[in-house]
């Protein structure tokens, strides 16, 4: 409008003036006006405020493409951390390199380019300037915009506080949040009917309601503490050792600004390197694994409701100005385990976190687990080394019944593992790896080589070998098998941006299992996974994507009382188109699946779905989802992301014939209070019951309602970051 006003004044002046201008002068004025118009438009384009996509679009674009029947592990704590960061975005002009490196979709070159640009320009004027950062492609910009904001001045050395606060201030001057969610099923499962002859396994002790309460406190990145209580559906309340709920989890984190130490008390997570000792430092996504970023050992609070994968105790980190860092922790937990009849030996671990039947309650916290670890690292800009050791002692011997596939599984009371990880950064290359050895000398190793020949292209290769007898109880690397052992493989990945707003990415993963597995009774079975995705964005409001996935794996086949192996192959194709405006967004998606076996079995499945969101006002928003699916059987099942309440995540598998719908309403009657309601309905056309055994529903309908209340106390002046 301002430019239009200026141009109009110039034209009126020229028309009213008696001065005669030459044709050459008129051309110059015309060129000036055109260039001014282009410049103003560029400035307004750069000053685009707000994220380029919503949280739901990020989950559907980045996470859900990697979730299928393969069962890749999605770290719930990291997913929840990303969701909370999306709700409280980092200030891009004050965030540090460590903050940006925590995002799994960014590589170090992109982070360095962003920081260099910020230093030269004395800060970002808006998120639109991300398009001027070298190496920052369209989708990286969109993903990052979900978690950062631009509403503060640039500070050269990071955040500086003019007020000296005591530790007590860190623990009291921040923001408080209380959240409660109640899930109500509008149906009845078989397990809630007490049979005439009750036993320890044929009915649920509690009611069908699921309830979770969360309390969270945070003071920027410097302090945090929280408490989580959860009751799963079917679990009792205030009886049989539940006070009042089954699951309690709390944590305290203190990491004062400009201090070189941090401390964690209570429940915490450990992530390190490539995951041969502890969980991998990021999501276990093969497409993202090609980014080639080394993430050293880190502690983080356990904030999710996952009742199995965490430590409980004390963790401490201390770093020096010369790049040295020391980490140490000690943990003690009571695990769910199935014991022998005399109770002196554990036979298996129960990791579902469910305690609904008497037999599940009997297994609750029956095995003590003491874990300690120490590590030292030297991290420089061009290279780094890290040495970590972990010791675990069970209170009772662990010995699972012998089967053909578990002869090399852990047995005993004590396990000890040590790992050495490294990274090297030659020009245009990124090399990292990890070697781990257990107390018996069995080795596992994983190495990654990435090469970037321009900001538009990146290729990577990863090689792994896990000894069949290697034991690491907390390892979680990227693999096709269910544990970090008995596997060798190679992964090749590619990421290419041929033209602006177009991205092609994919990988090929080959694996061989040295010893028999649960699914393949013959040694040296093989598996191949392939993935190819193309994404195109014509503008900031419309995107088109296509993804193809191939999964081929050998399984046991019994022919004439003789065991052999057969390949079972699954092809999946997904096409999606998304529209996004300031107050609404919509995604139309089509999925297809073809499942075949070597003996001639063939199954087909397809699904069409629509997901949308609408911000009616600043206080009311509506999200919806509807899908129609037809599959021949469960092996041709398909997946789709549905709108979820905050801090909840699940991937719905669609099989057989039916329709599914979800409606989610969020209302803020006052600034600090948010009320949310989620209703879902699933209808099968070719079934008169759903699920089996104690979870059986004697109906073709499955309807659920969830209510969530969230109250947030705003941060005080000195609690902002």
Model-found features: residue ranges?
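Exposed, low-structure sequence patches enriched in small/polar residues
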Residues: 28-29, 201-208, 247, 309-317, ...
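Surface-exposed loop/turn segments flanking beta-strands in extracellular/periplasmic regions
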Residues: 284-295, 340-358, 408, 643-648
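Short helix/loop capping segments that flank catalytic or ligand/cofactor-binding pockets
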Residues: 190, 273-275, 327, 336-339, ...
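Residue-level recognition of beta-strand termini and adjacent short loop/turns
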Residues: 96, 107-110, 137-140, 220, ...
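Bacterial Sec-dependent N-terminal signal peptides
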Residues: 1-49, 718-721
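Outer membrane beta-barrel
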Residues: 240-299, 303-336, 456-472, 619-634
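Compositionally biased linear targeting/interaction segments
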Residues: 27, 45-237, 243-254, 258, ...
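Aromatic- and glycine-enriched pocket-lining scaffold segments that form the walls
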Residues: 308-356, 365-367, 371-375
């Amino acid at each position: 409008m301002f430019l239009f006003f200026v141009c109009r004044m110039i034209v009126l002046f020229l028309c009213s003036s008696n001065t005669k201008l030459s044709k050459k002068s008129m051309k110059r004025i015309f060129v000036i006006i055109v260039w001014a118009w282009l410049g103003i438009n560029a400035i307004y384009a750069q000053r685009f405020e707000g994220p380029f996509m919503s949280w739901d679009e990020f989950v559907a674009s980045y996470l859900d493409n990697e979730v299928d029947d393969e069962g890749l592990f999605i770290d719930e704590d990291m997913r929840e951390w990303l969701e909370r960061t999306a709700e409280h975005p980092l200030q891009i002009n004050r965030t540090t390199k460590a903050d940006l490196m925590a995002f799994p979709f960014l590589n170090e070159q992109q982070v360095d380019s962003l920081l260099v640009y910020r230093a030269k320009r004395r800060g970002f004027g808006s998120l639109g300037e991300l398009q001027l950062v070298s190496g920052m492609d369209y989708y990286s910009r969109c993903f990052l915009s979900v978690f950062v904001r631009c509403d503060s001045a640039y500070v050269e050395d990071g955040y500086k506080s003019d007020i000296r606060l005591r530790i007590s201030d860190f623990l009291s001057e921040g923001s408080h949040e209380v959240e409660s969610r109640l899930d109500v099923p509008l149906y009845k499962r078989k397990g809630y009917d007490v049979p005439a002859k009750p036993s320890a396994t044929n009915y649920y002790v509690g009611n069908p309601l699921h309830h979770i309460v969360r309390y969270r406190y945070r003071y920027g990145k410097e302090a945090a503490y929280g408490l989580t209580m959860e009751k799963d559906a079917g679990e009792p309340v205030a009886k049989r050792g539940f006070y009042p709920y089954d699951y309690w989890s709390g944590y305290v984190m203190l990491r004062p600004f400009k201090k070189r130490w941090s401390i964690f008390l209570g429940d915490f997570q450990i992530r390190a390197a490539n995951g041969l000792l502890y969980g991998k430092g990021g999501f276990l996504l093969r497409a993202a694994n090609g980014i080639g970023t080394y993430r050293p050992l880190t502690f983080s609070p356990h904030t999710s409701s996952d009742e199995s994968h965490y430590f409980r105790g004390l963790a401490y980190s201390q770093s020096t100005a010369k790049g040295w860092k020391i980490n140490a922790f000690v943990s003690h937990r009571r695990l769910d385990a199935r014991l022998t009849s005399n109770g002196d030996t554990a036979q298996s671990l129960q990791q579902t976190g469910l305690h609904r039947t008497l037999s599940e309650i009997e297994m609750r916290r029956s095995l003590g687990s003491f874990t300690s670890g120490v590590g030292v690292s030297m991290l420089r800009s061009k290279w780094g080394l890290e040495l970590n050791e972990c010791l675990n002692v069970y209170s009772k011997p662990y010995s699972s019944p012998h089967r053909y596939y578990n002869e090399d599984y852990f047995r005993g009371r004590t396990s000890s593992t040590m790992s050495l990880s490294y990274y090297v950064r030659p020009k245009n290359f990124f090399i990292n790896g990890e070697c781990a050895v257990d107390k018996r000398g069995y080795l596992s190793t994983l190495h990654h080589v990435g090469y970037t020949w321009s900001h538009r292209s990146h290729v990577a290769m990863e090689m792994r070998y896990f000894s069949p007898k290697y034991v690491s109880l907390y390892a979680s690397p990227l693999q096709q098998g269910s544990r970090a052992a008995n596997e060798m493989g190679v992964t090749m990945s590619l990421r290419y941006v041929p033209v602006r707003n177009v991205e092609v990415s994919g990988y090929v993963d080959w694996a061989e299992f040295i010893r028999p597995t649960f699914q393949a009774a013959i040694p040296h079975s093989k598996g191949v996974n392939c993935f190819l995705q193309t994404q195109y964005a014509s503008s900031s409001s419309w995107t088109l994507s296509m993804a193809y996935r191939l999964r081929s794996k050998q399984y046991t086949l019994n022919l004439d009382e003789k065991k052999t192996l057969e390949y079972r192959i699954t092809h999946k194709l997904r096409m999606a188109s998304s529209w996004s405006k300031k107050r609404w967004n919509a995604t139309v998606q089509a999925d297809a699946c073809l499942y075949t076996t070597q003996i001639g079995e063939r199954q087909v499945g397809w699904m069409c779905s629509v997901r949308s969101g609408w911000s009616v006002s600043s206080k009311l928003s509506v999200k919806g989802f509807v899908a129609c699916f037809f599959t021949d059987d469960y092996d041709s099942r398909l997946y789709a992301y549905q709108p979820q309440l905050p801090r909840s995540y699940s991937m719905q598998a669609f099989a057989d014939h039916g329709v599914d719908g979800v409606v989610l309403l969020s209302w803020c009657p006052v600034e600090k209070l948010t009320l949310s309601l989620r209703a879902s309905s699933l209808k099968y056309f070719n079934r008169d019951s759903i699920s089996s055994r104690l979870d059986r529903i004697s109906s073709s309908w499955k309807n659920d309602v969830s209510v969530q209340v969230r109250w947030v106390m705003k941060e005080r002046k000195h609690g902002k970051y």
